[in-house]
A protein has these predicted regions:
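Histidine/acidic residue-rich metal-binding segments in metalloenzymes
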Residues: 49-194
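Gly/Ser/Thr-rich active-site loops/lids in small-molecule metabolic enzymes
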Residues: 211-224
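Short, ordered loop/turn segments at secondary-structure junctions
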Residues: 8-10, 40, 64, 91, ...
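Short, conserved beta-strand edge motifs with alternating hydrophobic and charged residues
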Residues: 193-197, 203
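Short helix-capping segments at alpha-helix termini
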Residues: 28-33, 144
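Metal-associated gating/positioning segment near the N- to mid-region
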Residues: 1-30
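Active-site beta->alpha loop and helix N-cap motifs at the rims of alpha/beta catalytic domains
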Residues: 37-46
Length: 224
């Protein structure tokens, strides 16, 4: 692990100067590797007086609880006014279904086209970074100039291997063909970053009837 970045959807949520500064202070006193703290993208962000001056490592845009019009509109706004990375969770809000899950495959079926449809609409920009690529089709459709990353679980795990609903992650686990395509792209340097997408949920949370999405990626990177 060469760098750790704090996503704004952790506790406390990061969308203001004070929370950002508090997290930087804690990380400065404890981190033994490079670190970065991100700020959530939300309406009005680019109009805040500190937008151009706050020393955030990156901006982060999520597709949850937002219309597709607002999601892509915010991406364009930020990219037009920043020289810091805009990190996106690249799933199209219109292609993310919330149907109840009875098994792990349901979660994948609910989002079959979400990543490719999202990335094909994103504008080309060297400041756009696509977090946790999960589909080979999404990789092929990502905009020119954009950077990207992939996680071990999207390189090595798939629905043929994992059946338990406690393997639920966002974006979902995909197919063996997606594993193979992404692994080849990673091996050839077309995807330059291996990321953990660390989500430190407890065993009890993951074994519940409604497990949260995510894997403890820092612990599982080496075993995988």
């Amino acid at each position: 692990v060469t760098a750790v970045v704090d996503m704004p959807n952790t506790n406390p949520f990061t969308s203001d100067q004070k929370t950002f500064a508090d997290k930087v202070k804690i990380a400065t006193s404890k981190s033994v590797v490079d670190f970065g703290v991100g700020i959530n993208v939300e309406p009005g962000l680019v109009d805040r007086p500190w937008f151009d001056t706050i020393p955030s490592a990156f901006w982060k845009l999520y597709p949850y609880g937002i219309t597709s019009e607002d999601y892509f509109g915010l991406a364009e706004q930020v990219l037009s006014k920043t020289k810091k990375p805009l990190v996106i969770h690249g799933e199209h809000p219109d292609f993310m279904d919330d149907k109840p899950l009875t098994n792990l495959a349901d979660h994948t079926d609910n989002r079959l086209k979400a990543e490719p449809e999202c990335l094909s609409r994103m504008p080309p920009s060297p400041y756009l970074h696509i977090a946790h690529l999960s589909t080979f089709e999404g990789f092929k459709r990502k905009p020119s100039l954009a950077t990207s990353e992939v996680c071990p679980h999207h390189l090595l795990l798939n629905l043929d291997i994992c059946h338990s609903i406690n393997c639920k992650v966002d974006p979902p686990l995909r197919t063996k063909l997606d594993n193979q395509g992404l692994y080849k792209a990673f091996k050839e340097g077309q995807i330059p970053i291996l990321a953990s997408d660390h989500a430190p949920h407890t065993v009890d949370e993951k074994e519940s009837s409604t497990p949260p999405s995510g894997m403890p990626g820092v612990e599982t990177m080496v075993p995988l």
